[in-house]
């Protein structure tokens, strides 16, 4: 015993300096406070956020009776489409506790209490939902920093205004809270409970040198910690406990405990955001003096975790003595929303079970941040006008909402595709790192005060538009400008460039504007003087020949008309003519559709004998052209002006839209009161056919469904962001998602599509669509937005998950539709109840949850709370990576814990397994760490 105490003393000598250094690295921000101060209860210094963040407004709470000085104010942020962020400095690869708190206090003019999103970098941390105005809501993450900073952001208000009360950063020691999965997962603290606590107060710094918050087991919030077994008593000691193990629980926590004097300890604990994979620790220390013939042995009583229940806990034996910590760990366990846990004594034990503390943390998947090279360039650009409002936008440039001056791709990681900083008071040189923004398609830096020469941008092979006019740029024009393969528009007017213009820029392939660069040389212009002189000399001769030339021209025009008439007759005989799409009798410049004569189509379709379906435009027939190309022919004989407008609209739209995930238009015909559209034939029918149609189709496996969802989402995302003006489909449904011969999905049926004007956010129109898919907000307001398509796509995602039709009294009973039914199950944490039985035995639960989560967001009642299609694509791609096992993800260490919640009893243990290397079933038993 003396040796142990000596070792403990020596260890403490080394630990104390480290703990003291920890405190100096604490970051404690009082949001809304106007000045710095020291908390007299803890001795910790708190700083005002007035110099940290420009946005938002401080609010002083009316009730100032709080013991903590930190909860007398809060900072409120606007309810717009921006995010508001605090940046905290970190050391790369070091672990930290990041903690935010929220006390509403009852002030505010909102009709509903606030509900909004909380993000750390690009990862959605939590949905903050205020239900009690006088309760402090705490959100805590354990992270390993991957850079020199982390961003904590609030955004996306559903009701009320986003706000924050405090923000804290606490560095951790050595390998505390290390996991095998920290490259891909944060730890979101779900519970940290001090059993046997002397009062209701939470225990934290200075009693815990790392300032963890240990909640008292006496302070039982509704549904938080209930169900104490009879005979549970509280014990404590003042003796020193050796707590120098991996997680360093505080001494005061280990000096108290609960004991089951009747042989059982039992609790029920609600875990928010569960079911999920979790990391759990139990802390035991024998703090009672046991007699020579007394023993304390017990087991975890948990029927769903037989591997854990087999292990016997003998604290004194496991910890090598009394008053010494034993901390068995459960590094990867799947837990339900409602966790019931019990410890029961073994038959050969004389004493009941004992418990000092527990910690449970959810594995929170880390979302990929925007490409680092892109972010570094954006940061450099922001430093060129640091006091501007646009430069103070924080967090990730692309996720969860875009900065106001960038556009991003939907890839993983996201890449910046557009920088729009016209007239933004930029000063200095263009950052050289811009050459590594390979996804950039548009660069707008005009009307600023840029100086210096153009940096190397030869790697910007996707660049289409570059505007640099009205700056103070100088030097020669680099040769690479003539060799950017996709460059369409380049403007360098009103600068100080000099030297020769690369000849390729003058050949007409690029819209090139370069006026008012006095020292810029154009060889063609140097020859211009002599050309003018020659023309002047020849002018007299031209005047003399004018009359004769006019006569010759008149004759030539007459011959041309006769030739054109003959050519037109000849090409119509062939049945295929290239026309510009027509709207209201006027030619459109944006694209070309092909006119196919009616006889040609009658021959191709065998007089329209093989009907393969019907869409909003009309009946669809199978055809084969003379060259062997298979086509789908959509036809209507209705001569109404409404359908005429619809026909013209669809031809005009599809003539200029080309994307791999949109069904391409091949041609059209308008003869004999028939309006016909000819599309590429899709061999595998529609998604609706496979989910709800003939039994001839083999059930789609989960990975195929995810791939189809991704394809369709990319098609819709292109309509929303890749077209100018953007296009709203407004009839998204599973029967309008067609599958080609390789089972790749393409979105079809643009008969109901609508274009939005560039300066509008919506289109007013009579609500049209399909029952079960129709956005309720659109139906009520008649205001069509891109979020109407997002709602309909959310319904499609629920179809993919469940295999059920959107509307079915048989399937959904009183819920009537798939949205109400699925959301009610998700609220209960029962995603298993949604899964199509055809695929239930062969899916990974985390991928299912990822899709269910984004589908649930898509069908939010209010459009501004729904994600953009770009965010939906990212979520689906996350699910695909999890399903394929390409992430260093988790593998569940337990049987399915959803049995108590799910009505589907056919789900197997493997349903909840997530792949991961180096974890075997032998590692499932509790292990001292």
UniProtKB/Swiss-Prot annotation:
Residues 1-21 form the signal peptide. It catalyses: L-seryl-[protein] + ATP = O-phospho-L-seryl-[protein] + ADP + H(+); L-threonyl-[protein] + ATP = O-phospho-L-threonyl-[protein] + ADP + H(+). The active site is at residue 731. The modification Phosphoserine is found at residues 735, 764. PROSITE patterns: PROTEIN_KINASE_ATP, PROTEIN_KINASE_DOM, PROTEIN_KINASE_ST. SUPFAM superfamilies: L domain-like, Protein kinase-like (PK-like). Residues 553-929 are cytoplasmic. One of its GO terms (cellular component) is membrane. The chain crosses the membrane at residues 532-552. LRR repeats lie at residues 413-437, 438-460, 461-484, 485-508. The keyword Nucleus does not apply. Residues 22-531 are extracellular. It is a single-pass type I membrane protein. The modification Phosphotyrosine is found at residues 679, 778. ATP binds at residues 612-620, 634. Its main location: membrane. The keyword Disulfide bond does not apply. The modification Phosphothreonine is found at residue 770. Residues 606-880 form the Protein kinase domain. It comes from the Eukaryota. Keywords: ATP-binding, Glycoprotein, Kinase, Leucine-rich repeat, Membrane, Nucleotide-binding, Phosphoprotein, Receptor, Repeat, Serine/threonine-protein kinase, Signal, Transferase, Transmembrane, Transmembrane helix. Its EC number is 2.7.11.1. Belongs to the protein kinase superfamily. Ser/Thr protein kinase family. This is Probable LRR receptor-like serine/threonine-protein kinase At1g67720. It comes from Arabidopsis thaliana.
